[in-house]
Amino acid sequence: MNTEFLKNTFSKVIKDYDTARPGYPKELYDKVMSFSGIGKDAAVLEVGAGTGQATDLFLQGDFRFDLLEVSEEQVLFLKQKYGNNPKVTVVKDYFEQYETEKKYDLIYSATAFHWVDSWVGYPKAWEMLNTGGTLAVFWHMSSVTYYEGGIFDGLNALKKKFLPGESLGFDAEGILKVKERRVAQIQSGGCFGAPEIYEYRWTDTYDAERYVTLLNTYSGTQTLSEEKRQRYLEEVRKYIVVNGGRVELPQHVMLYLVRK
């Protein structure tokens, strides 16, 4: 599947993404703050701001923000959301191509840096940071994790029916390999050392409607034809309704922190 196509699928489902995707825990923000030590008016860059879920968390700090996004739709959404905040600037550009004389005290990316070529992205982040500056990259893992038992068995069966070529997700060993790969990518180019890694877990309760909305934000779902996508979502909705009406979805976020 074309990477550019997958990057831009999210611009089609902005409102669904903002409604249904899980946010990030305050503990993550607190850890980034304690690690970075940044203070008022620090220069902060967010790579791949999406709908601003992580932005909302970091805005509790009195910093100066540049938000980077690639699609016109998402840039417009962010400008409408933060247009009245004089400390927020929204920029339409790819991180690999982004040029500025500015140096940053913190660069962070929330479930987005995998879209950036690691051999370009991590050395570029190093160059864009002030000495002592922090890079914080973190990802939600629930969308790529294999869950089984209970309601998940039926959800997995429906996914195999409509998306037979798509993985059901990583098991514990697979998640560990993802972690190891990301550590290696952070160190690619010989700039950053080994990151500090922190993990956050909780459980979200989704009713049928919100779970279907979440499912609609996944790039695999968006590759389906309109007719097939609607049938898939409707079958999932009906399945959840007749099986208790809710999904207890484990959430898992991995945070990687490095300093220049």
What are these regions (language model features)?
Residues 132-201:
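Conserved catalytic/acceptor-binding region of the Class I
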Residues 97-107:
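A short acidic, Gly/Pro-enriched loop at the edge of an enzyme's catalytic core
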Residues 12, 17, 24, 31, ...:
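Tryptophan-centric aromatic hotspots in well-structured domains and transmembrane helices
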Residues 120-133:
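A short glycine-rich, Lys/Arg-flanked "PGG" loop and its adjoining helix->strand segment in the class I
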Residues 1-39:
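Conserved class I S-adenosyl-L-methionine
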Residues 51, 172-260:
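Conserved Class I S-adenosyl-L-methionine
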Residues 105-120, 141:
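A short SAM/SAH-binding and catalytic strip from SAM-dependent methyltransferases
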Residues 43-45, 50-98:
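Class I SAM-dependent methyltransferase SAM/SAH-binding core
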